Amino acid sequence: MEDFVRQCFNPMIVELAEKAMKEYGEDLKIETNKFAAICTHLEVCFMYSDFHFINEQGESIVVELDDPNALLKHRFEIIEGRDRTMAWTVVNSICNTTGAEKPKFLPDLYDYKENRFIEIGVTRREVHIYYLEKANKIKSENTHIHIFSFTGEEMATKADYTLDEESRARIKTRLFTIRQEMANRGLWDSFRQSERGEETIEERFEITGTMRRLADQSLPPNFSCLENFRAYVDGFEPNGCIEGKLSQMSKEVNAKIEPFLKTTPRPIKLPDGPPCFQRSKFLLMDALKLSIEDPSHEGEGIPLYDAIKCMRTFFGWKEPYIVKPHEKGINSNYLLSWKQVLAELQDIENEEKIPRTKNMKKTSQLKWALGENMAPEKVDFDNCRDISDLKQYDSDEPELRSLSSWIQNEFNKACELTDSIWIELDEIGEDVAPIEYIASMRRNYFTAEVSHCRATEYIMKGVYINTALLNASCAAMDDFQLIPMISKCRTKEGRRKTNLYGFIIKGRSHLRNDTDVVNFVSMEFSLTDPRFEPHKWEKYCVLEIGDMLLRSAIGQMSRPMFLYVRTNGTSKIKMKWGMEMRRCLLQSLQQIESMIEAESSVKEKDMTKEFFENKSETWPIGESPKGVEEGSIGKVCRTLLAKSVFNSLYASPQLEGFSAESRKLLLVVQALRDNLEPGTFDLGGLYEAIEECLINDPWVLLNASWFNSFLTHALR
């Protein structure tokens, strides 16, 4: 940077900047960005003043070449660049001559035409933020502020820009050139990020009148006036010991600090009860796809056309029958619903032209499955005021469920690799700055690790289903629309592939509020026999609908094909978040990036390449009863992604509560591991808050089990 400054700026400016830094005791060999900033600021001040004169009539004129005959006076007095003593002498002289108010801080220029001091700012941040900082520091209406940025923006007091447009354009062009030259040498990012805000001396902000009375009225209990409260807050040390904090609090706070030792924490108590059940909106590891490679059929890309084409690839259909009934439902209706789908798809195929969408006939079985006319009638509250025994209907407490092994299996499967590529991140232009090059490299490495991951398939499946369902809910509110569950991917050889998982039938969807529910029936293909883990499929009615021939190492074998049918519901807000499941990729990439940054700061160089290419190194993935599990960096990427995806698929109030409360206990345990001797009060209350979130959600129960494994190994 120092070499660049000496090449880029006039030697006189460089010399003045060196003097200024010496005066403030700063080393330009170390503070190279500051050196560049001072030179830039000096140059802008000089350019501001250049060629601007006042003629004999007192008018401001621009003269580019000196005319020896003209009696001209410089319009601007330059204060910036002089040593402090000389600068204050000039300021005092101007004030004595013109009667101007003496400024608190040294300004940069004095404008003889407008009779005002000018503060020039050059910022690498946003102009309005820098302007406010300057104004806050100067606190004077008599000093005019004019801010320039390296992006061509400017801001001035009362939008009075002092100079003509051409003069300002010269300054902006010069700043843009400096930025380009820095970027070409890889210096811009460091320079841009090094800017600090204006340092201001804090002053007491006095409140008077009505605002003062309101402030006195709105104090916490036990405070008589604002001054007392201020004194209390000022004396409240943010990093003081916890006992000191408690002693400052209200007398009603009665908390005894207990030391937190290795023997203090107990495991989180998981609930007893029947095993938990699958509650995701679509099947995960148990899903089966009917696929077509290199689709090129007529109407390719139209979901209904793609679905019919995929259905035609399977020849083992048979008369469906129920193998696992839903305990509370009318199972014959689920069976009739599937038969209706098959019949109506057959009707479509017999038509001359296949329609783009299909609305199902409103049969009794679909009306039942979609809860048509089942909602209680809504009555306006004003019409009920006179009813004496009006009360909210009683709702049962949810039944406690115990952790079941299937959810750990689901998670393990989500971390695995498939033989397909599920994401292709579009190119986003050529990298200009070094930081962009590093970001692209990290993104590409990460994409390579997760593009084949099953969790990524779940993302694309979730995005498609939620988008299709939300579209249909808005476009066909009264119809029972048939929505194919589709995803698209590429084979390892790069061939395109369209997959059909099953169908959704949407119920009536007059969704006014974000939380209004649309019911739907999902029908999904699977090779999983529900009789092996019936508790997992509590909410489903499962049919056997065909036999599938599978190729294996020992030849062909036939497996029964099942259809998992259930009634479900979702809302606008849930569909909106479902459509944005790609955010999970970003979240897990950022977590990986923080690991790379930590490694890079230790080694003092970017470690991205080594991080991803050193295949021999293992990293901690998580805790299990066996101890800390470790794996390759690819496995870490896929595990973090799977966690993020499951947080989206199994989002619930139970998860929100558990995450927030267990984090507090986690921080205390980490403080103990770091030998910080933590103390706690009401640890029992914290355990209570954590355990009240453990009700029946499989993902929350699994996280609690992992947390217990962590406690065991962390406190050995």
Swiss-Prot record:
<comment type="subunit">
    <text>Influenza RNA polymerase is composed of three subunits: PB1, PB2 and PA. Interacts (via C-terminus) with PB1 (via N-terminus).</text>
</comment>
<dbReference type="InterPro" id="IPR001009">
    <property type="entry name" value="PA/PA-X"/>
</dbReference>
<comment type="function">
    <text>Plays an essential role in viral RNA transcription and replication by forming the heterotrimeric polymerase complex together with PB1 and PB2 subunits. The complex transcribes viral mRNAs by using a unique mechanism called cap-snatching. It consists in the hijacking and cleavage of host capped pre-mRNAs. These short capped RNAs are then used as primers for viral mRNAs. The PB2 subunit is responsible for the binding of the 5' cap of cellular pre-mRNAs which are subsequently cleaved after 10-13 nucleotides by the PA subunit that carries the endonuclease activity.</text>
</comment>
<feature type="binding site">
    <location>
        <position position="119"/>
    </location>
    <ligand>
        <name>Mn(2+) 1</name>
    </ligand>
</feature>
<keyword id="KW-0464">Manganese</keyword>
<keyword id="KW-0479">Metal-binding</keyword>
<keyword id="KW-1104">Inhibition of host RNA polymerase II by virus</keyword>
<dbReference type="GO" id="GO:0039523">
    <property type="term" value="P:symbiont-mediated suppression of host mRNA transcription via inhibition of RNA polymerase II activity"/>
</dbReference>
<dbReference type="InterPro" id="IPR038372">
    <property type="entry name" value="PA/PA-X_sf"/>
</dbReference>
<dbReference type="GO" id="GO:0006351">
    <property type="term" value="P:DNA-templated transcription"/>
</dbReference>
<dbReference type="InterPro" id="IPR037534">
    <property type="entry name" value="INFV_PA"/>
</dbReference>
<dbReference type="Pfam" id="PF00603">
    <property type="entry name" value="Flu_PA"/>
</dbReference>
<feature type="binding site">
    <location>
        <position position="80"/>
    </location>
    <ligand>
        <name>Mn(2+) 2</name>
    </ligand>
</feature>
<dbReference type="GO" id="GO:0004519">
    <property type="term" value="F:endonuclease activity"/>
</dbReference>
<dbReference type="GO" id="GO:0075526">
    <property type="term" value="P:cap snatching"/>
</dbReference>
<keyword id="KW-0945">Host-virus interaction</keyword>
<keyword id="KW-1048">Host nucleus</keyword>
<feature type="binding site">
    <location>
        <position position="41"/>
    </location>
    <ligand>
        <name>Mn(2+) 1</name>
    </ligand>
</feature>
<dbReference type="GO" id="GO:0030430">
    <property type="term" value="C:host cell cytoplasm"/>
</dbReference>
<protein>
    <recommendedName>
        <fullName>Polymerase acidic protein</fullName>
        <ecNumber>3.1.-.-</ecNumber>
    </recommendedName>
</protein>
<feature type="binding site">
    <location>
        <position position="108"/>
    </location>
    <ligand>
        <name>Mn(2+) 2</name>
    </ligand>
</feature>
<dbReference type="GO" id="GO:0075523">
    <property type="term" value="P:viral translational frameshifting"/>
</dbReference>
<keyword id="KW-1262">Eukaryotic host gene expression shutoff by virus</keyword>
<dbReference type="GO" id="GO:0046872">
    <property type="term" value="F:metal ion binding"/>
</dbReference>
<feature type="binding site">
    <location>
        <position position="108"/>
    </location>
    <ligand>
        <name>Mn(2+) 1</name>
    </ligand>
</feature>
<feature type="short sequence motif" description="Nuclear localization signal 2 (NLS2)">
    <location>
        <begin position="184"/>
        <end position="247"/>
    </location>
</feature>
<keyword id="KW-0540">Nuclease</keyword>
<dbReference type="GO" id="GO:0042025">
    <property type="term" value="C:host cell nucleus"/>
</dbReference>
<feature type="binding site">
    <location>
        <position position="120"/>
    </location>
    <ligand>
        <name>Mn(2+) 1</name>
    </ligand>
</feature>
<keyword id="KW-0378">Hydrolase</keyword>
<dbReference type="GO" id="GO:0039657">
    <property type="term" value="P:symbiont-mediated suppression of host gene expression"/>
</dbReference>
<dbReference type="GO" id="GO:0003723">
    <property type="term" value="F:RNA binding"/>
</dbReference>
<keyword id="KW-1157">Cap snatching</keyword>
<keyword id="KW-1191">Eukaryotic host transcription shutoff by virus</keyword>
<keyword id="KW-1190">Host gene expression shutoff by virus</keyword>
<feature type="short sequence motif" description="Nuclear localization signal 1 (NLS1)">
    <location>
        <begin position="124"/>
        <end position="139"/>
    </location>
</feature>
<keyword id="KW-0597">Phosphoprotein</keyword>
<comment type="similarity">
    <text>Belongs to the influenza viruses PA family.</text>
</comment>
<keyword id="KW-0255">Endonuclease</keyword>
<dbReference type="GO" id="GO:0039694">
    <property type="term" value="P:viral RNA genome replication"/>
</dbReference>
<keyword id="KW-1035">Host cytoplasm</keyword>
